């Protein structure tokens, strides 16, 4: 277990319990308002929330409605080793299954640079969302969502999330401009089965949206990781790294001996940020999804490596 300590007057923490898809906006809005009431100078917000069944775009929207769209949101949602059953969040001595917390930072000299990358490629014909409510998908291609999704994966409808999450990333097509910045044509999403054949999507999803099945490309995972680090280092030229937060998906790295080997991937992202031969304070977690900017906006990602470099 790794611990990163933060001290001083320029941060504050708040949390909530009972956050779900339907109330994600209201719960996050209440936390953001509490943060602002304690420190109106907050200019960046770290979030950790339950990852399995909330609407992450609603969380972003709530924070921005309080602090404005210029606030940088970074962090992740918690996972359970890709099982999609239950995840945990801890604040102080309280452990919850459907909780979230925010950490607001207000040091005017402290900045954060964020970026995410995945390295998966889209395959086959898209699934079309033909019926949805908020972040819940009811039908793909006019058929019960879970049945059609598992059929496209070559699995039976009795499969569970532990079977589908490692191989069933869905891709939303990006604009050409965003694809060039992202290094990929698609933004990935994780889905889980909750009630009947309904599926929980990671964000709100509109009817008519096309979603592609994807497959991991090991070479692309590593080349895009290198590209991301190079770009971040260029943007930070002349700056001093203070600390690094890091959120990562378990489905990334070298696939060997029926498991994912992460050591090489982690070393490739850490070494470029060393200062005088030493790694800066670095706190990483395996998550369900990651928050990082794309196209100048706060965006929720899945199946990525995301780095959040705090610097002065």
Cite the ranges covered by each PLM segment.
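Small-residue-enriched flexible segments
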Residues: 1-271, 285-312
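C-terminal regions of mature proteins
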Residues: 278-279
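Short FAD-binding loop at a beta-strand-to-alpha-helix junction that anchors the flavin cofactor
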Residues: 282
């Amino acid at each position: 277990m790794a611990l990163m300590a933060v001290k001083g007057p320029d941060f504050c923490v708040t949390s909530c319990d009972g956050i779900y898809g339907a109330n994600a906006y209201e719960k996050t809005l209440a936390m953001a308002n509490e943060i602002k009431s304690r420190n109106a100078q907050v200019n960046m917000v770290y979030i950790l929330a339950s990852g399995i069944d909330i609407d992450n775009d609603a969380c972003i929207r709530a924070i921005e409605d309080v602090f404005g769209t210029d606030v940088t949101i970074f962090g992740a949602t918690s996972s359970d080793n890709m099982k999609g059953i239950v995840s945990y969040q801890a604040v102080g001595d309280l452990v919850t299954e459907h909780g979230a917390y925010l950490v607001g930072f207000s040091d005017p000299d402290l900045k954060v640079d964020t970026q995410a990358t995945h390295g998966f490629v889209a395959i086959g014909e898209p699934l079309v969302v033909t019926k949805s409510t908020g972040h819940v998908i009811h039908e793909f291609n006019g058929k019960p969502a879970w049945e059609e999704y598992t059929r496209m994966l070559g699995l039976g409808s009795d499969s569970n999330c532990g079977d589908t999450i490692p191989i069933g990333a869905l891709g939303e097509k990006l604009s050409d401009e965003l694809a060039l910045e992202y290094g990929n044509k698609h933004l990935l999403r994780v889905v889980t089965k909750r009630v009947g054949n309904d599926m929980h999507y990671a964000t709100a999803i509109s009817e008519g949206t096309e979603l592609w099945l994807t497959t991991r490309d090991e070479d692309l995972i590593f080349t895009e990781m290198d590209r991301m680090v190079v770009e971040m280092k260029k943007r930070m030229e002349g700056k001093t790294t203070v600390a690094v937060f890091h959120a990562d998906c378990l489905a990334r790295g070298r696939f060997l001996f029926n498991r994912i080997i992460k050591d090489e991937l982690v070393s490739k992202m850490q070494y470029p940020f060393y200062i005088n031969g030493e790694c800066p304070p670095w706190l990483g977690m395996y998550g369900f999804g990651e928050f990082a900017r794309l196209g100048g906006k706060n965006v929720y990602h899945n199946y990525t490596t995301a780095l959040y470099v705090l610097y002065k």
